[in-house]
Amino acid sequence: MRKYKYMKIGIASPEEIVSWANPELQGKEFKYDPKKKDKVTYVDDNGDSKELVLRGEVKKHETLNYRTQKPEREGLFCEVIFGPTKDNQCACGKTARKIVGEHRICEKCGVELTSSKVRRERMGYIALAAPVVHTWYLRNTPSKIAILLDMKTKEVEEIVYLASYIVIEVNDDIEELYPGQILTEQENAVFKRRYYGRYKATTGAETIKYLLSNLNLKQIMEEIRLELKTATKQKKEKLIKRLEIVEAFLQSTNKPEWMVMDVIPVIPPDLRPMVLLEGGRFATTDLNELYRRIINRNTRLRKLFELGAPDLITKNEKRLLQEAVDALIDNSKRNKKVAQEKNRPLKSLSDILRGKQGRFRQNLLGKRVD
């Protein structure tokens, strides 16, 4: 049994989330590109560049086949991604296998012949068609993203949920607009007709990611320290909050843009099981329903992009995807909770960890041991 002295929670980069599903990439240097989501180029131990076809992406919302009761391929319980359901037995039951490194993999179905216990530890991921903001850093009080960008929380939320625009670039000859200005949908439409092509205003999680990635943290830290010398008491409190977040990012290896996600981790299937009941019905955890919503909306958005759908339609679908990810991470913090029958709110990842009945206090802490 492994012993842990402490646990540290940080922000996971897209590369780290992808490496959880691809152990060959752990500890390796590579860059994940959402546009080329199927392949990555990494640097091996000898310093050579190698290309790897990624595995572990959950593409379908299906769980189990209703006829065979076996996991659907590329679904939420896929044996290729998460490992076999029975010890040393692949999905097709054939004995044909080939050696891939240290692993035994069936040539026909691609399932690794190993212990079924790996289904408790192997992770998958969902590659998102559009970035989404992590709700912990947006909605929790105080909002880390709002403080870091020196904006009001309401303004950031309106941009994330595509209700407002923020001016990114503007020509010098336009006096009515300035970078960082918040515009409503109607105002942006008016200015677009008046100054078409002479300014740039964007919305959505992509905009927040762009703003966060362009922050010069060292420069911001120096500016805040200078401002603190002459600031009033009320202003000082606000500046100190911002300084603490900036210093925390500089001291850690985390980057501000990681608060906007291109990839979502899918936890192992044995931690969100489906149980067969009498009469052929299944009982399942709420997490599977929350993941299913994300995959459905993500697939629909990807198809809309491929078809070249109008901006109005894709914007609405992006908002639905953001709301689906919010519900998965923290359903209780949302104004309109995602619920099932009898209006029971679905239990999100945060709800599983939080409170007296949460995983930490109920299962891990305060236990008598021999």
Where are these regions (language model features)?
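Conserved core architecture of multi-subunit DNA-directed RNA polymerases
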Residues: M1-D370
